[in-house]
UniProtKB/Swiss-Prot annotation:
PROSITE patterns: CRIB (PS50108). It comes from Mus musculus. InterPro entries: CRIB_dom, CRIB_dom_sf, SPEC. Interacts with CDC42 (in GTP-bound form). Interacts weakly with RAC1 and not at all with RHOA. Its main location: cytoplasm. This is CDC42 small effector protein 1. The gene is Cdc42se1.
Length: 80
């Protein structure tokens, strides 16, 4: 009899939980940006391979010169 339970135990395994199907997002589900404030522009040539770290400080300084954006109330960038 114990041999029966031994064989039965070998066949019973815990089944993995089925993965939840992720909802696929398409373009119609994505709206326009909210609270977007354009602070600066970085061109493709400005962040070259050799000067990336040095340029980062310059970009941060340029953003600081635009004013303290954290103190400004955020608003929608679209005109109503």
């Amino acid at each position: 009899m114990s041999e029966f339970w031994h064989k039965l135990g070998c066949c019973v395994v815990e089944k993995p939980q089925p993965k939840k199907k992720r909802r696929r997002i398409d373009r119609t589900m994505i709206g326009e940006p909210m609270n977007f404030v354009h602070l600066t522009h970085i061109g493709s040539g400005e962040m070259g391979a050799g000067d990336g770290l040095a340029m980062t400080g310059a970009v941060q300084e340029q953003m600081r010169s635009k004013g303290n954006h954290r103190d400004r109330p955020w608003s929608n960038s679209r005109a109503l």
